[in-house]
Swiss-Prot record:
Domain comment as written in the entry: The C-terminal KXD/E motif functions as a Golgi retention signal, certainly through the binding to the COP1 coatomer.
InterPro entries xref list: EMP70, MFS_trans_sf
Nucleus as UniProt keyword: no
Domain of life per record: Eukaryota
Annotated motif Endoplasmic reticulum export signal, positions: 637-642
Official protein name in the record: Transmembrane 9 superfamily member 8
Record-stated family: Belongs to the nonaspanin (TM9SF) (TC 9.A.2) family.
Record motif Golgi retention signal, residues: 646-648
Lineage, top ranks: Eukaryota, Viridiplantae, Streptophyta, Embryophyta, Tracheophyta
Parts of the chain that traverse the membrane: 286-306, 356-376, 382-402, 423-443, 456-476, 507-527, 539-559, 578-598, 605-625
């Protein structure tokens, strides 16, 4: 029996090592993931009209998006809202038509968009947005508008791109200390295109802008034929950065103008997003991978030592005992065989959390597969969030199945009650936090507030699809025969001896969460930067590697600590296995708090509440995901070792 256990343990460890090695090799060359465009390419002939769209105003200081036309910019005769998917609405996107008129490959200079005379209210609105460093986001042919910024990186010049341009800027006139607000009222657009030599048709591969603040002047009365003296296409006078800036004050007249330049590019349409997705910190990601792999190898060595040496020796010794007296003299994990599968306290709640963890695990895994295949690229705006929501809903089937299977193993009979709690506990907590945050956003009149129609759609996804699927999964899982325990449970619980200080439940649980968090914290930095500093994150190959390492780390650290716990004759492993790996969520939230105070510039109370509210939801989801991994690892481990020894 011992040799059979040894062989099975070796096979498991070898297959696990091969699996990790195979995954690593699969992604070592394509860690960025490849890109499948979210839309079909569109060809433009010379003179074709190009439709520019405006999106939300964004700020990393407030994290509150606003509609472009919430400020008194020049408007088209009729504002038309673009159709948006669920993810776009939840992100606060508000895509609308713009008054800009572009003709393909026809340069324009100093086009007058319109003029606005500021009153006290509009001047205050512009000043507030400038002070909060809001950026204007636009879209052309599904490409976001970027501002090119030249910088010197390691002695060589390079260009980085920032999404959107600032509404304005703050500064002082020469010789004055009084701070003034200036408006970016002239935009110099550059549209880059790739031309087909055979057909002469062109495809757009870049959309850039350089914003200027200029106090436009003109002679005579204002009319449709007015020519500006500060920017005149007839005299080829261009706007320059040294021009007198346009101040934002009450009763000031602001004239909005723009240039359009077209530049041919060697970049092909299929590669046009490379500029936006180009990452210059690959070395840091690889360091993260290597760092995490070192943790995995260390834990794998410990697990191998336990399973291939200690357990083999223990099982051989236990199986060779001749008398009951000799067995009673032994100490260690075998002594608790009659209690190790005793029903845990709050077993119903454990079933619910395990089912929810399976739902989270399935959602994350499938989402990453789609992301690596390119279906959730940034060109598919809102696609990532939409996919995660829909996958969460449909993974309810597996949540119900997992919770009811465990519930039946615990000899439960009321599977409908478990299915109900599985369908409602986690979503109810998340929804309560979400509704409070949404109310705060509504109070700020931000476009980030979820409309009632979208709210109804979310409720329908929950009650109309997710809940029934949880019950279907629960029914299927409960109908299957329960897994038998490898050993019988004694009627009278065994007394647990006094434990050493390092085996204290709270201490061991907190220690157990450090390594899983250590495996992901570097990648977590880039994810937080992407979310809260308005940058692209599209390195799902790296992320998938880290995710696999996280799974292995959670499983191994929990198994190691579970073994030490059983050797101390403490058989209350059910909840502790869940909390050991799940405690990594506590470190995630603490790191998010550290990130808030060291990297973000948020000053408003509402914005801070939004940040910590969303990070609380993320930490809660991380808790159930990692906790479930640790629980199943320990369940497999205990069933394996106790099925491999002779029990009299």
């Amino acid at each position: 029996m011992a040799m059979e256990f040894l062989r099975s343990s070796r096979r498991i460890l070898e297959s696990s090592g091969c699996a990790i090695a195979l995954i690593f090799l699969l992604f070592i060359h394509g860690a960025h993931s490849f890109y499948l465009p979210g839309v079909a390419p569109q060809d433009f002939e010379k003179g074709d009209e190009l439709k520019v769209k405006v999106n939300k105003l964004t700020s990393i200081k407030t994290q509150l998006p606003y509609s472009y036309y919430s400020l008194p910019f020049c408007r088209p005769s009729k504002i038309v809202d673009s159709t948006e998917n669920l993810g776009e609405v939840l992100r606060g996107d508000r895509i609308e038509n713009a008054p800009y008129s572009f003709k393909m490959r026809e340069a324009q200079m100093c086009n007058i968009l319109g003029r606005v005379t500021l009153d006290a209210k509009t001047a205050k609105a512009f000043k507030e947005k400038i002070d909060d460093e809001y950026r204007v986001n636009m879209i052309l042919d599904n490409l976001p508008l970027v501002v090119p910024i030249e910088r010197v990186d390691q002695g060589s010049p390079s260009v980085v791109y920032q999404l959107g341009y600032h509404v304005g800027l703050k500064g002082q006139y020469e010789g004055s200390k009084e701070q003034k607000f200036f408006m970016h009222n002239h935009l110099a657009f550059t549209v880059r295109y790739h031309r087909d030599i055979q057909t002469d048709a062109a495809r757009i591969v870049g959309f850039e802008v350089k914003p200027y603040s200029v106090k436009h002047e003109y002679e005579g009365e204002w009319s449709e034929k007015t020519r500006l003296t500060t920017c005149d296409p007839h005299t080829k006078r261009l706007v320059v950065s040294s021009a007198t800036p346009q101040e934002v004050e009450q009763k000031k007249e602001i004239i909005f103008t723009y240039d359009v330049d077209f530049q041919e590019s060697e970049v092909k349409w299929a590669s046009r997003w490379d500029t936006y997705l180009l990452m210059s910190d690959n070395q840091i990601h690889w360091f993260s991978i290597v760092n995490s792999l070192m943790i995995v190898l260390f834990l794998s060595g410990m697990v191998a030592m336990i399973m291939l040496r200690t357990l083999y020796r223990d099982i051989s010794r236990y199986n060779e005992l001749e008398t009951q007296e000799e067995a009673q003299e032994e100490t260690g994990w075998k002594l608790v065989h009659g209690d190790v599968f005793r029903l845990p306290t709050n077993s119903d709640l454990l079933c619910v959390y395990v089912g929810t963890g399976v739902q989270c695990l399935g959602m994350v895994f499938v989402t990453m597969i789609f992301a690596m295949l390119g279906f959730l690229s940034p060109s598919n705006r809102g696609g990532l969030m939409t996919a995660m929501l829909l996958l969460w809903v449909f993974m309810g089937l597996f949540a119900g199945y997992a919770s009811s299977r465990l519930y039946k193993m615990f000899k439960g009979t009321e599977w409908k009650r478990i299915a109900f709690r599985t369908a409602f506990l986690f979503p109810a907590v998340v929804s309560a936090i979400f509704f409070v945050l949404n109310a705060l956003i509504w109070g700020q009149k931000s476009s980030g507030a979820v409309p009632f129609g979208t709210m109804f759609a979310l409720i329908f996804l929950w009650f109309g699809i997710s809940v029934p699927l949880v019950f279907v999964g629960g029914y299927i899982g409960f109908k299957k025969p329960a897994a038998d325990d490898p050993v019988k449970t004694n009627k009278i619980p065994r007394q647990i001896p006094e434990q050493a200080w390092y085996m204290n439940p709270v201490f061991s649980i907190l220690i157990g969460g450090i390594l899983p968090f250590g495996a992901v914290f570097i990648e977590l930095f880039f994810i937080l930067t992407s979310i809260w500093l308005n940058q692209f994150y599209y390195i799902f190959g790296f992320l998938f590697l880290v995710f696999v390492i996280l799974i292995v780390t959670c499983a191994e650290i929990t198994v190691v600590l579970c073994y030490f716990q059983l050797c101390s004759e403490d058989y209350l492993w059910w909840w502790r296995s869940y909390l050991t790996s799940g405690s990594s969520a506590l470190y995630l939230f603490l790191y998010a708090t550290f990130y808030f105070f060291t990297k973000l510039q948020i000053t408003k109370l509402v914005s801070a509440m939004l940040y910590f509210g969303y990070m609380l939801i993320a930490s809660y989801a991380f808790f159930v995901l990692t906790g479930t991994i640790g629980f199943y690892a320990c369940l497999w481990f205990t069933r394996l070792i106790y099925s491999s020894v002779k029990i009299d």
